[in-house]
Amino acid sequence: MALDFRNPVAIITKNELVTRDIDVLSQLAAFDCAAVYLSITTLDANLARRLEPRASTPENRLHAVRALNEAGVPVGVLAAPIIPGLTDHEIPALLKAAKDAGAQFAGYQVLRLPHGLKDLFREWLETHVPTQAGKVLNRIREVRGGELNDTRFGARMKGEGVYAEQIKQMFTLARKQAGFSAGGPRLSIDHFRDPTDRQATLF
């Protein structure tokens, strides 16, 4: 339906299966109506397997970036979620790998732990990286005003404080060094097809 009406589509995914629709996405991209972000938490395959067991491997996500780029689909990466004290040091390598794979833009988000996720994540840390658990939780509190989560608009995605600023500066420098521009994709509604009979055209 998006293709039929040339409706702009932006996709954020951790799954390489987005390439199954590469033919549709490339047709939409011809009208500036498509963009895809592959979200990558870490390049460490072992860590990724423990963090995101049901998601595509980092290598396969980069393969998806390459395939989408070669098909003419605007594609970028989200370094997300960045886990302070665990994955933030990977930002430069992650952005370089993404650029080498053909990513055209990049962004980031810091880990959020709303509701019951706080307890689940604490349990995960104690199970999988027990020697780093205390450090990671303290770093998260540093960027969340002493708490493990911050729901305030404008703060929840990037965090606040000295450590959040360090992450921001690291990302900004790494993005520049990798060759990314500061902007993201620009989608167009210039080619949107407005049906004369909306109900009839659905069937």
Regions found by a protein language model. Name each.
Residues M1-V65, P74-L78, F105-G107:
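Core AdoMet radical
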Residues M1-P8, H63-V75, V143-G146, M170, ...:
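A structural motif corresponding to the C-terminal end of an alpha-helix
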Residues L28, R66-E70, K96-D100:
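Short, conserved, surface-exposed binding loops centered on an aromatic residue
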Residues E52-N60, L86, H128, V162:
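Alpha-helix N-cap and loop-to-helix initiation/capping positions
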Residues I12-T19, I83-P92:
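Active-site glycine- and acidic-residue-rich loops that bind
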Residues H89-F203:
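Auxiliary Fe-S-binding modules of radical SAM enzymes
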Residues A10, P53, I82-L86, A155, ...:
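Conserved aromatic-histidine-acidic binding/catalytic patches
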Residues L43-D44, I82-G85, R112-H115:
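Short, catalytically relevant binding-site loops at active-site mouths
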